[in-house]
């Protein structure tokens, strides 16, 4: 069943992809000799099959026997630990993509700057803008990270002022 699922797979590492979860675990389990063209065909087949069995064993161990729970997002997570106290850790976020994919990711902060029009610039900063637990901006962007969503990155003064939630004024003494 796993071979057929991966053979019919579209190659996209979406969070929901069962075939993607199997492939990623297979890729980490398969012996490098299986990909070496100088390895005899019969040995390569055996190594590939052993890698697939190892992937299934690992998915069963990590995610349980219910194959409907075998989703790529569950094996490709971004941890969101608090820098100071683990009590304030946020739940890990399921993410699409992965190493070797077009949507390779790892960083929780991204910026896309449009130098032709700064108003088109966007960013992602998970888990949020604030490192202070209890702030409404502490974990508010974690879901965006998992969905590959961005927020407008404000550069133009009137946009910054219109988008500000608070204003802090420092006055010298």
Q: Model-predicted segments: where are they?
A:
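C-terminal/peripheral segments of proteins
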Residues: 4, 8-173
């Amino acid at each position: 069943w796993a071979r057929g699922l991966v053979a019919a797979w579209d190659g996209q590492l979406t969070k929901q992809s069962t075939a993607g979860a199997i492939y990623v675990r297979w890729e980490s389990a398969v012996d490098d000799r299986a990909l070496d063209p100088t390895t005899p065909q019969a040995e390569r087949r055996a190594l590939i099959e052993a890698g697939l069995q190892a992937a299934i064993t690992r998915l069963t161990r990590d995610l349980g026997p219910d194959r409907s729970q075998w989703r790529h997002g569950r094996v490709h997570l971004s941890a969101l630990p608090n820098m100071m106290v683990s009590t304030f850790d946020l739940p890990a976020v399921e993410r699409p993509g992965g190493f070797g994919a077009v949507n390779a990711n790892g960083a929780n902060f991204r910026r896309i700057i449009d130098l032709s029009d700064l108003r088109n610039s966007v960013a992602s900063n998970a888990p949020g803008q604030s490192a202070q637990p209890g702030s409404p901006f502490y974990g508010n962007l974690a879901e965006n990270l998992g969905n590959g969503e961005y927020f407008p990155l404000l550069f133009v003064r009137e946009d910054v002022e219109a988008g500000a939630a608070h204003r802090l004024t420092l006055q010298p003494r």
